[in-house]
């Protein structure tokens, strides 16, 4: 006998449960249809959907069994709501989940800091081989540290080294401090609020690493809307995108020990930089996992403190 309600109506059928795997595929289709931009932690719709679905459900990607788990109505609603924010507000998924990975390590991020995505991660994982002898790197500076990901990854890869992490933004340093605590590196990673080298005194380093702002005014205006959620201070650097890099080139030698090195990511301003500084022997590093626009200069190859001058203004 079929059950009926006291009103004489049949009860509404239960909503169909869906597996986590099915929700991920559904989400990926939504993201592709919406033509969102990928590049802030993931480079495809399925990985982005997986990150959002698992976060909405409070599940870990490390457990393969979760993908077959069945999800009820409320869980599906949470997933749809998070995907809707990603699509309608164009918020990068990493800001919605608060979690990203860099050099094999997890980091907390929010809109106070740039989302880590630098190919420098690959250098750190290789301990800068074959270009540098890691055993001689005893003191490192991460200039423009943001979330602290480069500084922390260097400290993990070089457990004998002390690392300074400098940033102009007090808000960024708050995020970096949270990550330093998370990785229990308070005794080895030291945060400094500084406009480039201004607060570092006479400190000298074996290695200075930097992923500074390098986006020019015109390029910034043409970026996908996802970039508008990142701090402009961490992206823009003058009309041609070279303002911050010029400071690094002018002042880095005064903060490097003999035999030290400067490694800087400049993205697609590579050619503009070479035109502006034709006298500098930039070594452009290659990456197995893709990416580019990262140069290395030895301390002795850099101009004397304050002597770096571009060939023409606004180059």
Each model region followed by its residue ranges:
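N-terminal auxiliary segments of SAM/dcSAM-dependent transferases
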Residues: 5-103
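A general structural signal for well-ordered alpha-helical segments in protein cores
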Residues: 24, 49-50, 79-80, 147, ...
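Alpha-helix termini
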Residues: 34-39, 127-135, 256
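Short, conserved glycine- and acidic-residue-centered signature motifs
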Residues: 45, 113, 241
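SAM-dependent Rossmann-like transferase core, predominantly class I methyltransferases
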Residues: 66-67, 73, 77-160, 166-175
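S-adenosylmethionine
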Residues: 125, 160-162, 166-315
């Amino acid at each position: 006998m079929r059950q009926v309600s006291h009103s004489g109506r049949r009860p509404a059928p239960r909503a169909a449960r869906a597996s986590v795997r099915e929700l991920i595929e559904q989400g990926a289709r939504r993201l592709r249809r919406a033509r969102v931009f990928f590049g802030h932690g993931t480079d495809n719709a399925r990985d982005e959907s997986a990150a959002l679905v698992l976060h909405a459900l409070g599940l870990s990607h490390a457990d393969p069994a979760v993908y077959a788990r069945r999800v009820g109505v409320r869980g599906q609603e949470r997933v749809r709501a998070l995907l809707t924010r990603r699509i309608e507000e164009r918020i990068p998924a990493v800001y919605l989940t608060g979690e990203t990975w860099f050099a094999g390590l997890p980091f907390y991020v929010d809109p106070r800091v740039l989302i880590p995505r630098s190919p420098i991660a690959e250098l750190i994982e290789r301990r800068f081989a074959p270009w540098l002898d890691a055993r001689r790197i005893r003191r490192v500076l991460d200039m423009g540290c943001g979330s602290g990901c480069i500084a922390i990854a260097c400290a993990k890869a070089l457990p004998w080294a002390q690392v300074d992490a400098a940033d102009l933004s007090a808000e960024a340093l708050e995020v970096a401090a949270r990550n330093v605590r998370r990785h229990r590196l308070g005794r080895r990673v030291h945060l400094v609020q500084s406009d480039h080298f201004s607060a570092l005194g006479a400190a000298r380093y074996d290695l200075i690493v930097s992923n500074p702002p390098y986006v020019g005014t015109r390029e910034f205006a043409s970026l996908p809307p996802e970039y508008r959620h990142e701090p402009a201070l961490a992206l823009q650097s003058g009309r041609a995108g070279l303002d911050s890099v010029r400071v690094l080139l002018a002042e880095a030698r005064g903060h490097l020990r003999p035999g030290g090195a400067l490694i800087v990511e400049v993205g697609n301003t590579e050619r503009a930089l070479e035109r502006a500084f034709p006298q500098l022997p930039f070594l452009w590093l290659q990456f197995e996992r893709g990416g580019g626009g990262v140069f290395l200069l030895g301390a002795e190859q850099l101009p004397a403190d304050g002597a770096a001058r571009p060939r023409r203004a606004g180059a």
